[in-house]
């Protein structure tokens, strides 16, 4: 009996399939016992016989109808997983993809099916899956390395075919996969946190050359803040010098918000309008200042020589006179012992003018801080170097005259 002959007159398709192609019929129906019995008696050539209806072999029939057990039996009996039909050059993978059977596809791939083989119109299994809108089959193929950008003989990709057939969801899925495939070089690039050597993003909170607030706090020394209320000119002084790092050119501590600049009741007014006495700020003298432009005296800035007018180095205290000269006073003791003067003029937390003997020697970190035993306002200002950065010299020069005038006014009342 010639299996390749055309349908005979007087026989229906079902009768002809049962009589002339029993292996094909068993694979179509998933009749595993009948298939096993036929495989034991049928010659090996029957495994590659093509029917007269579609030109398929038994393994193509099993793949089209999703009969995984039949596929296994056929391959075990010697059928090729890459068997190509004579008429359309299609493999079982093409047929399983078009039928929408991802389980059969996965198994065929595992036993060696070529998922990128093109048929007579240049289509691979993923094109067939797109034609039928089988997203599951597409996913199975892509997971095993199927090429989604291949074009058929008409120049169409799988996404184009899905769109043409009206499977918009499938088409969009393929387009997304195609974009990911074309842009996969971004996987270690800018879209996924790449270019790590290009420097931190200032808007992402990345690490920069500035030390973090937590690092400074852990060391017991507060760090400068740039967002303080216009205190960009207020530079912490230590041993008559300043640090060359621009990060330390701003006030560290966040001062209290000033609701009324004329009340002179907040710490901010004392710091911005007060005078320097014995290396500390005097609140009483600060309250005497009125009628002056608070905006111009908003910041106490460095003089060009690196010293705030009225504030001297730790070893020697000087006061500016009305003619602009400096009048030396007696030498001061170790400034670390004078760490309570800030609260000796009306502060409710005023306790001691000298550092208590039971407090450990803070070294150089409390030269301009204060200690009152409660720990709620004690500050420690980090030691600074002796070089003023050139970038801030212009701003310092502009505010220097205002600071000198304010200091003279406080001392002489003129």
Curated annotation (Swiss-Prot):
Entries under InterPro entries matching the protein: Ank_Repeat/CDKN_Inhibitor, Ankyrin_rpt, Ankyrin_rpt-contain_sf
PROSITE patterns assigned: ANK_REP_REGION (PS50297), ANK_REPEAT (PS50088)
Region of interest (Disordered), residue spans: 310-332
GO MF, one annotated term: chloroplast targeting sequence binding
The keyword Repeat appears for this protein: yes
Keyword list, A-Z: ANK repeat, Repeat
BP-aspect Gene Ontology terms: protein targeting to chloroplast
Keyword S-adenosyl-L-methionine appears in the UniProt entry: no
Alphabetized Pfam families for the sequence: Ank_2, Ank_4
ANK repeat extents: 18-47, 54-83, 88-117, 121-150, 154-187
Protein's UniProt name: Ankyrin repeat domain-containing protein 10
Chain's gene name: ANKRD10
